[in-house]
């Protein structure tokens, strides 16, 4: 049986460690798409920091876990954000806890057929149940490499690609280098060869962008950094070129995750 979320591209920006800008990239890419009239659902799956909710200055009183347990419509847990065309769904529990629910709950996401994109913001690790589930539910994922911690970040990206592509049947759509300095073309080409992916965007280290999380500011909408805006536009162009995935065997993927974690 097909459990896919109708007429949506489901995407995760993945990264191996926290504090490297994954949430900022997710929110700004969503804002850029929303500005073009696309409808976006952001799933804040990071229970610990609630990063997307913080950045967008949104507070949820009803969570996905609540509506599943109480058998309420999923839309009851979705809240508006200050940005037109962007809505947010907070999970309320660790993503790992959702593996204990009946797989048939995924059918209820058919209610959400009016979005163009779903972005899942999961905890920042290259392994673990939360990462596996976010990748498993995503049609595509984009590894984000932190240039200021390049060695661990590159290894994390390699791990994520191996698991996401070969085990969880999600497709890597390219990679992003974040907090970069000026990079020789030879270095970028080496990374392409190692990961087997194209480079979508190189976002240079910028204190204005890094401080935007604390300030709860979406830099793309303020146009306060033209280079950053240009790089987000490159990401959006790549996302718009991705083909819609017609069918995925999500129950099979979920079972793989359960088996690997002994749940």
UniProtKB/Swiss-Prot annotation:
Query: GO CC terms for this protein?
Result: cytoplasmic side of plasma membrane; cytosol
Q: Which residues bind ATP?
A: 16-23
Its domain of life reads Archaea
Q: Which UniProt keywords apply?
A: ATP-binding, Nucleotide-binding
What molecular functions are annotated in GO for this chain? ATP binding; ATP hydrolysis activity
The family database entries (InterPro entries) matched by this protein are listed as: AAA_dom (IPR025669), P-loop_NTPase (IPR027417), ParA/MinD_ATPase (IPR050625)
Alphabetized Pfam families for the sequence: AAA_31
Q: Which family does it belong to?
A: To M.jannaschii MJ0547 and MJ0169.
- The protein's name is Uncharacterized ATP-binding protein MJ0924
Name the source organism: Methanocaldococcus jannaschii (strain ATCC 43067 / DSM 2661 / JAL-1 / JCM 10045 / NBRC 100440)
């Amino acid at each position: 049986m097909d459990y896919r979320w109708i007429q949506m591209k489901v995407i995760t920006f993945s990264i191996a460690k926290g504090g490297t800008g994954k949430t900022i990239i997710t929110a700004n890419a969503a804002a850029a798409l929303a500005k073009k009239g696309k409808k976006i659902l952001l799933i804040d799956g990071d229970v610990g920091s609630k990063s997307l909710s913080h950045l967008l200055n949104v507070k949820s009183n009803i969570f996905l876990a609540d509506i599943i347990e109480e058998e309420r419509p999923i839309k009851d847990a979705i809240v508006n954000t200050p940005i037109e065309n962007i809505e947010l769904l907070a999970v309320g529990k660790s993503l790992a806890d959702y593996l204990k629910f009946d797989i048939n709950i995924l059918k209820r996401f058919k209610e959400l057929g009016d979005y163009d994109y779903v972005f899942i913001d999961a905890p920042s690790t290259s392994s673990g149940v939360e990462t596996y589930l976010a990748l498993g539910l995503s049609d595509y994922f984009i590894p984000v490499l932190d240039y200021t911690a390049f060695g661990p970040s590159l290894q994390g990206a390699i791990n994520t690609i191996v698991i996401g592509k070969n085990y969880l049947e999600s497709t890597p759509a390219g990679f992003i280098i974040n907090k970069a300095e000026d990079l020789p073309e030879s270095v970028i080409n080496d990374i392409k060869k190692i990961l087997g992916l194209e480079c979508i965007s190189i976002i240079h280290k910028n204190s204005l962008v890094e401080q935007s999380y604390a300030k709860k500011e979406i830099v793309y909408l303020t146009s306060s950094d033209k280079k950053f805006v240009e790089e987000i536009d490159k990401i959006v162009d790549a996302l718009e070129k991705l083909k819609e995935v017609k069918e995925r065997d999500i129950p099979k993927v979920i079972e793989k995750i359960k088996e690997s974690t002994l749940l």
